[in-house]
Amino acid sequence: MKSLRIFIPVFRFILKKLSKGYGIGKKQPVKTVFKLMDQFFRADIVDVHGHKMLLPKKGFDEYSTLGIYGEFDTSSVENLINKGDFVVDVGAAIGYYTLILARAVGPKGLVFAFEPKIERFEILKKNIELNGYTNVILENKAILPSEIKPTFFNVKNQQGGIRLIKKFETKNENLEPVMTDVIDLDTYFINKNKQNQISFIKIDVDGPELFVLQSSKSILNNKHLKILIEWDKNLSKKSDC
């Protein structure tokens, strides 16, 4: 069935013509079509916005079928980054934005990518290697202020990242505790003497985005700093954030 992936570009073209910027690709019926196409046509390595990406066995349907994840956000990031920039990807997952950032900053720039979930981190490493980038520093760590002593959880039977969930919800039988290293972002970059060189931060951590910002106070003083945050109100509440 993988050979039938040649029909996916046709589907992408039709969807783009129909959507005309109205976000049709985010509607549930279209998402259902994505999942069905992904189920039948999924390949281990796919072309995603100019990069080769190794995918896990499940999840990341849009990567497999659309070849892009959020067209507006993607183009916005590309327009915000300059050659030679030092940028940060917090919650890098398997590397979609890490790869885009690595291409955008060029060989004289640097990307610092943080991903705490080990399964995703291993795929992230392979995707950087697959595309030959040498301007990326990978860290298998979560970002939080030093005074927070967190317990992270993995949600069983889901493909998302690990979650920081407040105590009264941790009795949920679908949650399993996960050990991961945690670091304060300011401390990390002060130790490298680069706290004043960061020009862009992308944050997507399934809830505790505010905690990431609290751990970045020195970096936030940079006058020309640009930030992209993916925020979910419900996940933020569950993180007590």
Model-based region annotation:
Residues 91, 114, 137-139, 202-206:
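Active-site-adjacent beta-strand anchor residues
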Residues 1-117, 122-127, 131, 174, ...:
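S-adenosyl-L-methionine
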Residues 96, 122, 148, 210-214:
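Short N-terminal helix/helix-N-cap motif within the alpha/beta-hydrolase-1
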Residues 187-241:
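Conserved acidic-Pro-Pro-aromatic motif
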Residues 101, 124, 152, 212-216:
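Hydrophobic packing residues within well-ordered alpha-helices of enzyme cores
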Residues 50-74, 134, 139-193:
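Glycine-rich adenosyl-binding loop in Rossmann-like folds that engage adenosine-containing cofactors
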